[in-house]
Regions:
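Conserved N-terminal phosphate-binding loop of PLP-dependent enzymes in the Aspartate aminotransferase
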Residues: 1-306
Length: 306
């Protein structure tokens, strides 16, 4: 099971999952017809009307999951999803949705997998994006709120220098799982010792310089800057959203988005699109407020030329 607008990779089985706005990434490869369910993403600001809409989408998505489970009770190995969809449009979800999925996974004996390749390693202001789903005042070992939404498996990559998965105790219900049986999963181009040593140094520097906290603090500043930018360009910018430095906004059309990217390049800035008409921000963890200010100045100039 997976969500519409997801992105889980461009090799092997993941191409049966990826639902990219760019069809070239998977169109020429054979794929399994695995079930894809409604993506109940939040439209910001989360006012009463938008909340009603997202609750309706959540019910639709959960019902689609339940319907497939009822028709194929023994065929579902897992459900995989991104805590925040990246390439699909920087789509955010409510914790209540993940909690329902966790309950279904326990009731129907399938694993819940969070793909944190893009959202992991601090950029959202927490080490892993799914940690935002805990109650604000939860303790580290909370078993009431946090464990009711935690995944069974997490995938990681990109900033970690090598890709992989780690898993919780529920995997031990499976005899001879991949952490017990050698070579069940293998890779010619997988991680190597140099990658792992380099990432170890990165982790040490992140802890030493408190970069996850910095991403949280400067992320709030970036989001406030984007909200201010929207206020000055209310006819163009909508749906400002973000956690930590993982921020985005929407433009009226794909053409507006592509033109803005081109304008930003002319100003000397590299910026990425996502979804069909969104702009996403992915600063480095130690970005400074002064650099964010510079980016906003460039963005205002680029917007004025649309």
């Amino acid at each position: 099971l997976h969500l519409k607008d997801c992105f889980h990779g461009r090799t092997g089985y993941t191409m049966s999952l990826t639902d990219s706005p760019d069809p070239r990434k998977v169109m020429h490869f054979p794929k399994f017809n695995w079930p894809r369910v409604t993506n109940p993403s939040i439209k910001f600001p989360l006012n009463i009307d938008n909340l009603e809409e997202v609750i309706k989408l959540e019910k639709q998505s959960i019902n689609e999951v339940k319907d497939f489970l009822s028709k194929h009770p023994d065929d579902v190995a897992c459900m995989i999803l991104e805590p925040i969809q990246g390439e699909g449009g920087d789509n955010h979800f409510r914790p209540e949705y993940f909690k329902q999925l966790k309950t279904l996974s326990l009731e129907n004996d399938f694993l819940l997998i969070y793909d944190e390749v893009q959202t992991g390693i601090g950029i959202t202001g927490k080490m892993w994006a799914h940690q935002h789903f805990c109650e604000p005042n939860c303790e580290i070992n909370c078993k009431l709120h946090c464990e009711s939404m935690e995944p069974d498996v997490i995938s990681f990559g990109k900033k970690t220098q090598c890709c992989g998965i780690f898993a919780g105790n529920r995997l031990n219900e499976i005899e001879n799982h991949v952490f017990k049986e050698s070579s069940r999963i293998n890779s010619t181009f997988g991680g190597n010792l140099v990658d792992m040593v380099r990432f170890t140094i990165y982790l040490e520097l992140m802890e030493k310089d408190d970069l996850v906290y910095m991403a949280s603090e400067n992320g709030e500043y970036l989001l406030s800057c984007l909200s201010s930018l929207k206020n000055h360009n209310d006819d163009i910018i909508t749906n400002v959203r973000g956690k930590g430095l993982f921020c985005a906004f929407d433009l009226p059309t794909p053409d507006h988005r592509d033109k803005l990217i081109s304008n930003m390049e002319a100003e000397g800035a590299i910026i990425l699109g996502c979804g069909h008409n969104s702009i996403r921000f992915r600063p480095h963890l130690n970005v400074l407020k002064e650099e964010i200010d510079q980016a906003m100045s460039m963005m205002q100039i680029a917007l004025s030329k649309l």
